[in-house]
A protein has these predicted regions:
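Double-stranded beta-helix
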Residues: 135-202
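Generic beta-strand structural signal
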Residues: 87-89, 93-94, 105-107, 122-128, ...
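Short, structured patches in soluble enzyme cores that scaffold and shape functional sites
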Residues: 95, 111, 128-132, 141-143
């Protein structure tokens, strides 16, 4: 594998330098642009109307041909398998994040796993920028926070607790005021670099005050021990109807979550009642 900055087991986040070829990056960029030009009903604006534009969309791989091609032909799944030490890797979902120039809105500190309908320890989120990302606006992590605990997930714009009742989880600590207790790591990135992090690792990102776009494709991967964990609330992203098809504790063996490593031919003639 390419040069690695960081330690996965220790930090819960690493940077893989030069992981993707220029052709891979160009394909990912086309996928992002196609997605932004044709947003799904799951898309949202995560910034105020007067503040640039921070656009997110989810679960587009099955309708954006360039995205599916990137996932299946680039080395991203092999990298995920190598980092996790997994024998089988499934795609959980894709997530497009675009911060246009002049966007002040930060992505606040959060963990991904509390928003999801999965449990287990072998998982990986991959952050794939197709534009240069200066250190000042890159994704940052609290090293070692993948070991827990869970912190209260809140909405990004108005800090509402929509997923867990108030008081049921610990609130986020003051990370900036306690750098020795919560060491922050992050990397300046060039197209071709990818950042891998555990779904329980605390992370944040600044706005994009500069003149260039910050386009990112983030892919979420599931390893060997990940199982379905139906929630009493609407997850982000949602998977309507899935709890009727996969019981709690079942492996994520479902057409919505295809095996991407080792490579397998797509199933034919498979139907599902789960909403696409």
């Amino acid at each position: 594998m390419s040069d690695i900055d960081g330690d996965w087991e220790r930090d819960g986040a690493i940077c893989v330098r030069g992981a993707l070829s220029p052709n891979d990056v160009a394909l990912a960029a086309r996928a992002i642009d196609a997605n932004v030009a044709d947003l799904s009903p799951l898309a949202k604006r995560a910034s105020e109307s007067a503040d640039g534009a921070f656009i997110e969309d989810f679960r587009s791989w099955s309708r954006i041909a360039d995205m599916e091609q990137f996932i299946t032909t680039s080395p991203v799944a092999a990298i995920a398998a190598n980092v996790m030490g997994a024998t089988t890797v499934r795609l959980f979902h894709d997530h497009v994040l675009v911060k246009e120039p002049g966007t002040a809105q930060r992505t606040p500190w959060h963990q991904d796993i509390p928003y999801y309908n999965v449990d287990g320890t072998m998982n990986l989120s991959m952050w794939i920028p197709v534009d240069p990302v200066p250190r000042a606006i890159t994704l940052e992590f609290v090293a070692g926070s993948h070991r827990g605990p869970w912190y209260m997930p809140r909405t990004f714009l108005d800090a509402q607790a929509r997923w867990f009742p108030e008081g049921s989880l610990a609130e986020l600590p003051d990370i900036a005021a306690n750098p020795d207790q919560f060491p922050v790591i992050g990397w300046e990135l060039e197209p071709g670099d990818v950042v891998c992090f555990h779904m329980q690792t605390l992370h944040t990102a600044a706005g994009n005050p500069g003149p260039g776009r910050r386009r990112v494709l983030s892919l979420r991967f599931l390893g060997d021990d990940m199982v379905h964990a139906p929630r009493a609330w609407t997850t982000s992203p949602p998977f309507p109807g899935l709890k009727e098809e996969l019981p709690a504790g079942a492996s994520m063996d479902h057409p919505l979550f295809p095996v991407v490593w080792p490579p397998v031919p797509p199933p034919s003639g498979t139907t599902s009642s789960v909403s696409e």
